[in-house]
Amino acid sequence: MELEKIDEFLSSWSKGVIEIGKIYREGGDYIKSAKHFLSTHYAFEETDVLFKPTFTKEVVFRNNKKDALSYFVGRDISEDNGFALKPWGSIQLAELNTLIEEDLTAAMGTLKFKPYEIEETTLVAFTFIFRKIDETLKIKVHHSSPVT
């Protein structure tokens, strides 16, 4: 059951990132979409979150919702171009390892990010540690980095 929830979460997370970029391309309210994405997938509103995004150098960690939003849509931190605005055409799970215990759920694996209308892919390693909130998984710790 918990493994199904992890699979569903990862699918929803990937679709959410793609959707933000799609709304941006179409001239829609991508900020609203990104805020909804963060509220749905990250536990910023319920607890402390540790977030180390894939492509950060100057401000390495984004441990609050405002800074996480900047990473995904490029607003408040100068190095942010908007990770979700690339836009991505597909995000595919390449490898998944899980740890499911009584009070801990974690996923570690790789995702293949393919930009919209471009054939190159970027392989990213990720670790998500989840907290169950109202029977829903949300990210409490997120670390990701490119696989080079």
Where are these regions (language model features)?
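Extended aliphatic helical segments
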Residues: 17, 49, 59-60, 73, ...
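Residue-level marker of positions within ordered structural domains that often coincide
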Residues: 18, 112, 135
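Membrane-proximal amphipathic alpha-helices
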Residues: 2-6
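A solvent-exposed, acidic/Ser-Thr-rich amphipathic alpha-helical stretch
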Residues: 24-97
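Secondary-structure edge/capping motif, primarily at the C-terminal ends of alpha-helices
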Residues: 17-25
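Short beta-strand edge/turn micro-motifs at domain boundaries
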Residues: 100-108, 116-148
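Functional cores of ribonucleases/endoribonucleases
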Residues: 82, 87-118
